[in-house]
Regions:
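Glycine-rich catalytic cores of cysteine/serine-nucleophile enzymes that process amide/ester linkages
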Residues: 61-161
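A structural motif
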Residues: 147-190
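Activation targets extended, charge/polar-rich intrinsically disordered C-terminal tails
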Residues: 1-60, 174-175, 179-269
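Phosphate-binding glycine-rich loops and adjacent basic patches that engage nucleotide phosphates
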Residues: 131-142, 166-178, 201, 205
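Second-shell loop/turn segments in exported
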Residues: 83-86, 158-168, 193-202
Length: 269
C-alpha cells in the first residue's frame, strides 16, 4: 500500500501505534520496530506499509520516518556515508546523491544500483530481509532461501554527512544520473559473478566516481577525487565557489547515527 499516514508515534508497555490528529489509531495491529519506538516516541512521524514481509508474523513491514515538509525548490543532496566497521568493502565509506527527493545509489552489487525514496534509503527498519542474520549478525542467505541482507535504514547504520544545494535544474541533473543507471543495467553480466556489476572499478566506476562525473557533466567541472570522502570535500569546495554566480543556496550538515543494537557505530573513512 502506498497510503502514507501521519501522526504521533505512541507506545506503552503493551502496545504501539500512530495516533492521528482525529484521535484514530493506525498500525495498532502491526509490529512497529523497536528502533522507531526508542528514537521517535512522542514525535510527529509518517508511516506506510512496505511490500516486504516481517519474518516473525508474515505481515507487511511498517516503515516510519520523521514528518518533515518537502522542499518547494529544486535541490540536490550529496551524501558521504561513514564506513560500516563490520564489512571490509565499506572501508572507504559510501556516496549517494538525492535529486528532488529521489536518491541515486550506485554499487558493486547490481541490484543495489537503484533509485530509492528518501524514507527507504535512510529509515527502513531492521526487520525481515533488511535485518542482519540472527545467527551471525551479518549478511546471510540461509539454505532455505531466507535472506538477511543487513541493509536497513542508512541513518540507523551510520552517520551521514550532507551537502545540500538548492536552486539547481533538477530535471537536467536527474536525466544525467538516470543515464548512468541505464548504462549499468545494460552492462553484460559476468556469468561467474552474476550478482556483481561487471564494470565496477574503485578508481573509475564506483559510487563516488559516477557521482563526480555526473556533477561535472552538470557543470561543476572541477570536482575531483575518487574516494567518497574526497569527492564530498571537493564537491563542497567547488560548489561553494559557484553559489553566487549560479544563484545557489548551499549548506552542509550531518545526520548523526541513530544508534540501534543491530548496528555498531560507524567510523570516518
Amino acid at each position: 500500500s502506498n497510503t502514507v499516514y501521519t501522526g504521533i508515534l505512541t507506545a506503552d508497555e503493551t502496545n504501539s501505534f500512530l495516533l492521528r490528529r482525529d484521535g484514530s489509531r493506525v498500525f495498532e495491529e502491526n509490529h512497529i520496530w523497536d528502533g522507531y519506538i526508542n528514537h521517535w516516541t512522542g514525535q510527529n512521524v509518517c508511516a506506510r506499509l512496505l511490500r516486504q514481509k516481517d519474518y516473525e508474523n508474515g505481515e507487511p513491514i511498517v516503515i516510519i520516518w520523521p514528518d518533515i515538509s518537502p522542499a518547494n525548490v529544486d535541490f540536490m543532496e550529496l551524501y558521504y556515508n561513514e564506513r560500516l566497521v563490520k564489512y571490509w568493502p565499506s572501508l572507504f565509506g559510501h556516496s549517494a546523491i538525492c535529486v528532488n527527493g529521489r536518491i541515486y545509489n550506485y554499487s558493486h552489487l547490481i541490484n543495489e544500483n537503484e533509485v530509492i525514496s528518501i524514507e527507504e534509503y535512510f529509515y527502513r527498519p531492521a526487520l525481515g530481509e533488511f535485518a542482519p542474520s540472527p545467527s551471525t549478525g551479518l549478511f546471510e542467505i540461509l539454505d532455505d532461501g531466507t535472506a538477511y541482507y543487513d541493509k536497513f535504514g542508512r541513518n540507523f547504520m551510520r552517520t551521514i554527512h550532507v551537502l545540500r544545494v538548492e536552486g539547481i535544474n533538477g530535471s537536467r541533473m536527474r536525466s544525467i544520473f538516470d543515464r548512468f543507471l541505464e548504462m549499468i543495467h545494460n552492462t553484460p553480466v559476468n556469468p561467474k559473478k552474476p550478482e556483481k556489476w561487471a564494470d565496477f572499478n574503485l578508481f573509475t566506476n564506483s559510487c563516488s566516481t559516477l557521482i563526480k562525473f555526473g556533477l561535472r557533466k552538470y557543470g561543476f567541472s572541477k570536482i575531483n577525487g575518487f574516494l567518497p570522502r574526497d569527492v564530498f570535500v571537493s564537491a563542497a569546495y567547488e560548489i561553494l565557489k559557484y553559489q553566487n554566480k549560479e544563484n545557489l543556496s548551499v549548506s552542509m550538515y550531518s545526520m548523526p547515527q541513530l544508534k540501534v543494537p543491530e548496528a555498531p557505530y560507524s567510523k570516518m573513512s
